Amino acid sequence: QLIDDEAYAQSAVRYCAARLMGRRGAVRELVRKGVDRGLAQHVCDEAEAEGVFSEAAWELGRRTARKTVGMDRDVRKRRFWSAGGRKGHNPDILRQIAQELFG
């Protein structure tokens, strides 16, 4: 039985978003799983247009904010930026979220 590559890629993108990954992280994960890079980028572009990765970044920010309550503001920001970078989020959206959540 042949697997529809695009359906698999879309399913994998939803999985990546549930793990709060960004676009870069999702493309990297799809390619690692054997999806063609062009298809991976196409599916991630569609998901990005739907706001999937933006919402994942906001959820990552909210979780980081909850976990770091009471810590120094710079420490909280650094932890958020580190997590966002590891998960492959766009620095522009990370900057916006950090500004709003951590001042």
Per-range role (PLM):
Residues 1-103:
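An alpha-helical, amphipathic repeat domain used for nucleic-acid recognition
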